[in-house]
C-alpha cells in the first residue's frame, strides 16, 4: 500500500471533498447514529477528513479532548471542526500511547490501511478499559460497476477492497473487545459517467495499485459500456458496500476490582 500516494490524493481533494463526498456524508450520519448521545472523556477520530463525522460527534463530547486525526494535512487545512484538535498523522501509526482515549471513531478511512488486522487492533488498544468505538469502512462490492467496466474496456482500475467476512472475523477475534458488526449497501447516482468520475476525483477516491494508461478510445468504450450496463432512468449508478462495527474494549478481571 502506497500511503504517500493516498495522502497526495486526499491533500489535493481538500477543497472539493465536502461537495463530492455524498456517500461519505451518509455513512458519517449512519455511524453517528450508532454512537452515544453523550460521550465523556477523550475522543480520537481516525480519518477525520473534512469533518463530516467530527461535526456530528464533537458537540456530544464532554470533559475531554476531541482529537481529529487525518493522514492528509490538506484535508485538515480545509476542515471546519469547531471544538476539535487537528492532528496530521497516519492512523496506522498514531502518535499516542495505549489507554489514552475513552472513545474511538472512524468513518470511510480504515479500508485504506495496509495492514488492517494489526492496525485496527492497535487502534483499539488506544482505548481505556470500558472505552467505546464506532467504525465504518468500505468492503468488497464497492464500485463494482466501475470495476466491471474497467475490466471490460481496459480503462482505469479500482482499489481492491477486502470482503466483509474479513472484518467480521477480525472484530470477532480481537482480544478484549466486544463488537457488533453489520453491513449496509448504498447506491449513489450521477447525471453522467463523467460526473461520476469527477465526483470520485473530488472526494480523493482515485488511488489504485495498478494505474493503466488511458487512451481516448478506451475512455469512450468505458463510458459507452457503463451507460449501457448501469444507467437507471437517465442516471448512472455506483454502489458502496459498508461494514459498521461498534462496541467496547472490555475491562479485565483485575480492572473490575
Predicted segments with their positions:
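A short acidic, Gly/Pro-enriched loop at the edge of an enzyme's catalytic core
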Residues: 92-104
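Conserved Class I S-adenosyl-L-methionine
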Residues: 50-52, 178-257
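A short glycine-rich, Lys/Arg-flanked "PGG" loop and its adjoining helix->strand segment in the class I
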Residues: 117-132
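N-terminal, positively charged/glycine-rich alpha-helical extensions of SAM-dependent methyltransferases
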Residues: 1-13
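Class I SAM-dependent methyltransferase SAM/SAH-binding core
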Residues: 44-94
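Conserved catalytic/acceptor-binding region of the Class I
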Residues: 130-193, 206-216
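Conserved alpha-helix/loop element of class I SAM-dependent methyltransferases that forms part
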Residues: 22-40
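A short SAM/SAH-binding and catalytic strip from SAM-dependent methyltransferases
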Residues: 103-116
